[in-house]
UniProtKB/Swiss-Prot annotation:
A Gene Ontology term for the protein's cellular component: nucleus
Subunit comment: Interacts with its co-regulator aflS.
Organism: Aspergillus parasiticus (strain ATCC 56775 / NRRL 5862 / SRRC 143 / SU-1)
Induction: Expression is positively regulated by the developmental and secondary metabolism regulator veA. Expression is repressed during Streptomyces-Aspergillus interactions. Expression is also repressed by curcumin.
Coiled-coil boundaries: none
GO molecular function terms listed in the Swiss-Prot or TrEMBL record: DNA binding; DNA-binding transcription factor activity, RNA polymerase II-specific; zinc ion binding
Ranges of Basic residues composition bias in the record: 106-116
Role, per record: Transcription factor involved in regulation of the aflatoxin biosynthesis gene cluster. Binds with its co-regulator aflS to AFLR1 elements (5'-TCGSWNNSCGR-3') present in the promoters of the aflatoxin cluster genes. The ratio of the expression data between aflS:aflR plays a crucial role in the regulation of aflatoxins production. A high ratio, produced at a range between 17 and 30 degrees Celsius, corresponds with the production profile of aflatoxin G1 biosynthesis. A low ratio, produced over 30 degrees Celsius, is related to aflatoxin B1 biosynthesis.
Stored Pfam families: AflR (PF08493), Zn_clus (PF00172)
Subcellular location(s) of the protein: Nucleus; Endosome
Protein name: Aflatoxin biosynthesis regulatory protein
PANTHER family, alphabetized: MONODICTYPHENONE CLUSTER TRANSCRIPTION FACTOR-RELATED, OLEATE-ACTIVATED TRANSCRIPTION FACTOR 1-RELATED
Keyword Nucleus: yes
Length: 444
């Protein structure tokens, strides 16, 4: 009766429970806790202490943990796949506290039984972190993380401090992670940086594009881009007006000779000159009525436009050279490009054809054509006179603004003396054109 002892009377389980409670350690080692950084919770030494060469010690926890509870039906269904000890725990090697899947633990269990003394699997040197401990099932666990969309089940931690680590993992598992980004971030938290970088990131980017990329209307993708449009302002209007006043290339222009284009025969008539100058004066009046006219560069361009308009009026009236006033046919009106046939006084860019049958709305004879053209131009000079008065006001304002600016300062192209010279030159040119036309009419 005394020789046979029932197994239920053995105090073994009580001693093991007391021993497990007595050996319960904290989650963070002493070094990580003193530095207030997150510990990887690896035993016997964490990755941070191994990397820094520190002594990794885990102090005994003051809390004994929860009392053991009765196993639930849900635990009994998960117990066969979760309670398999890893090969690292059998050999005394630490195992990573990472999330895993039943498929991964099945592979780990197969390796543990087929190899009594397992060795770490051979991986490329670039995939192994320099501070990580070798784990037989690390590669399969990481690959299982990236290959499953559903949240991984809970894994019981083997070794020291299993209860408290299991509570921490159960808290983390309550957070819903329903994308591959969650698994990758959890793998990064547990120190598997090299394994995370070694995995293919194509599926991660595909998942991101499916969720975060907005849909683009196919019509918008196929729509052509709008044509380039230049900025329209007073400066662009002044440049366009000045360009229209130069329809012909000069006789000695190298570009005209290189391109082979001859525009000397495309002469303008008196009606074309009157119409073009009217458009130019309207554009100048619009520019001078804008606040942009206070700019010195724009005022300089306006002065050039008005001077060019006066040049075309003089050419239409036939008062540019003596040969034009004396005879109806001029050298500039011919299609000859030879400079020797044109006198030096008639080498001008404003070339007007003086042989039309119509001048304005009147049909005139060939003999009366120069006189009628001169009278028509003289009647149009009032436009230039009003522009000269308005421009003089703007030039005076620009000169007042430039009074305190040095002559070499880039804020204004001319000094006060330069603006005064522009006004004087413009008025002198206007008086010269009008007096030449009046003298020509008196001679006729």
């Amino acid at each position: 009766m005394v020789d046979h002892i029932s197994p239920r009377a053995s105090p073994g389980p009580i001693r093991s429970s007391q021993t497990r409670r007595a050996r319960k350690l904290r989650d963070s080692c002493t070094s990580c806790a003193s530095s207030k950084v997150r510990c990887t919770k690896e035993k016997p030494a964490c990755a941070r202490c191994i990397e820094r060469g520190l002594a990794c010690q885990y102090m005994v926890s003051k809390r004994m943990g929860r009392n053991p509870r009765a196993p639930s039906p849900l635990d009994s269904t998960r117990r066969p796949s979760e309670s398999l000890p890893s090969a690292g725990s059998e050999q005394g090697l630490p195992a990573h506290n990472t999330y895993s899947t039943p498929h991964a633990h099945t592979q780990a269990h197969t390796h543990a039984h087929s190899h009594p003394q397992p060795h770490p699997q051979s991986h490329p040197q670039s995939n192994q972190p320099p501070h990580a401990l070798p784990t037989p099932n690390g590669s399969s666990s990481v690959s299982a993380i990236f290959s499953h969309q559903s949240p991984p089940p809970l894994v019981e931690t083997q070794g020291l401090g299993g209860d408290l680590a299991g509570q921490a993992q159960s808290t983390l598992s309550s957070l819903t992670v329903d994308s591959e980004f969650g698994g990758s971030l959890q793998s990064m938290e547990h120190g598997n940086h090299a394994d995370f970088l070694a995995e293919s990131t194509g599926s991660l980017f595909d998942a991101f594009l499916e969720v975060g990329t907005p849909m683009i209307d196919p019509f918008l993708e196929s729509a052509p881009l709008p044509p380039f449009q230049a900025r329209y302002c007073c400066f662009s209007l002044a440049l366009q007006t000045l360009t229209c006043l130069f329809p012909h290339a000069p006789l000695g222009c190298q570009l005209r000779l290189t391109d082979g284009e001859d525009s000397s025969c495309n002469l303008m008539t008196t009606d074309m000159v009157i119409s073009g100058n009217k458009k130019a004066t309207d554009a100048v009046r619009k520019i001078l009525g804008c606040s942009c006219a206070q700019d010195g560069y724009l005022l300089s361009m306006v002065v050039l436009i008005v001077l060019k308009v006066l040049g075309w009026y003089a050419a239409a009236a036939g008062t540019q050279c003596t040969s034009t006033a004396a005879g109806g046919e001029t050298n500039s009106g011919s299609c000859s490009n030879s400079p020797a046939t044109v006198s030096s006084g008639c080498l001008t860019e404003e070339r007007v054809l003086h042989h039309p049958s119509m001048v304005g709305e009147d049909c005139v004879d060939e003999e009366d054509q120069p006189r009628v053209a001169a009278q028509l131009v003289l009647s149009e000079l009032h436009r230039v006179q009003s522009l000269a008065n308005l421009l003089a006001k703007r030039l005076q304002e620009g000169g007042d603004d430039a009074a305190g600016i040095p002559a070499h300062h880039p804020a204004s192209p001319f000094s006060l003396l330069g603006f005064s010279g522009l006004e004087a030159n413009l008025r002198h040119r206007l008086r010269a054109v009008s007096s030449d036309i009046i003298d020509y009419l008196h001679r006729e």
